[in-house]
Amino acid sequence: MAATNLENQLHSAQKNLLFLQREHASTLKGLHAEIRRLQQHCTDLTYELTLKSFELTGDSSSRTTELKRRCEELEAQLKAKEEENRKLLQELEQKNAAIAVLENTVREREKKYLEELKVKSHKLSMLSGELEQRASTVAYLTSQLHAAKKKLLSSSGTSDASPAGSPALASYKPTPPKDKLPETPRRRMKKSLSAPLHPEFEEVYRFGAESRKLLLREPVDAMPDPTPFLLARESAEVQLKERPLVIPPIASDRSATGQHSPARDKPHKTHVGVAHRIHHATPSQAQPEGEMRAVDQVNASKVVRKHSGTDRTV
């Protein structure tokens, strides 16, 4: 029994060994076939690579030259752009410096202009106040001259110098100029338009005979000349300007009594500058004298001043 079992085991072992040898041989055959196939593929690839390498060696020099030329062109363009950028930066810096200088100049000029404007405004306000005071003085002196003429006519024998039935006019007394009024933008503008350019002379309108306004030029501090109020100037060509009445008019002696005053009987020998030179002559026929205007309205800028190079003095 034991020998039979051993023989069976030996026989099965031999069969298994034979089977393994056959499988091993078939495996080796497949491996050899795969190796041959791979060797053939490698040979084909080597051949193709050799052919391509021969083709590339023909135009490699021209391609290299073209690439170098293109690279040099790009480098030149890059350098040009860098130079242009540098110039633009320099120009920008110069413009920024010029802008800073101009801004400083503008600020300095603006500061200087504001200072000058402040000084001129102060000077203008002072001159306006002085002008207003002098205008008030002129109006007050004009009223005093009217009163002096009235007294002169009454003392010469004309008792009808004032119209009857006007007690308010008879009791009228001129008053000195009032204090300076408060400044307002509108008054300041009117004063600036009528302010004189020369500080020593100014031209003002005065009332003359027959309600005519005589343009006289004289120093502002001098006493007004009473000649226009005492002498008749019928033939003089003077500038006329209507003004509203402030007080009732003073009737002339000629219109009330029909007589001439002693001052009117005198010949006209005095030459008066009235806006242009006027040669006086004795009138052939006496003209009626109008009503005399009294005090101007000072606060409404009624005193007219003109500036001229011609000296117009009485």
UniProtKB/Swiss-Prot annotation:
Subcellular location: Cytoplasm, Cytoskeleton, Microtubule organizing center, Centrosome, Centriole; Cytoplasm
Spans annotated as Disordered: 153-193, 251-314
Single GO term (MF): identical protein binding
Location of Phosphoserine modifications: 192
Protein's organism: Mus musculus
Protein name: Coiled-coil domain-containing protein 92
Post-translational note: Phosphorylated at Ser-192 by TTBK2.
Chain's role: Interferon-stimulated protein that plays a role in innate immunity.
Subunit structure: Interacts with CEP164.
Source species taxonomy: Eukaryota, Metazoa, Chordata, Craniata, Vertebrata
Name of the encoding gene: Ccdc92
Keywords of the record: Coiled coil, Cytoplasm, Cytoskeleton, Immunity, Innate immunity, Phosphoprotein
Compositionally biased region (Basic and acidic residues): 176-186
Xref: InterPro entries: CCDC74A/CCDC74B/CCDC92, CCDC92/74_N
Coiled-coil segments: 1-27, 59-113
GO biological process annotation, one example: innate immune response
Biased composition (Basic residues): 266-280
GO CC list: centriole; centrosome; cytoplasm; nucleoplasm
Pfam families xrefs: CCDC92
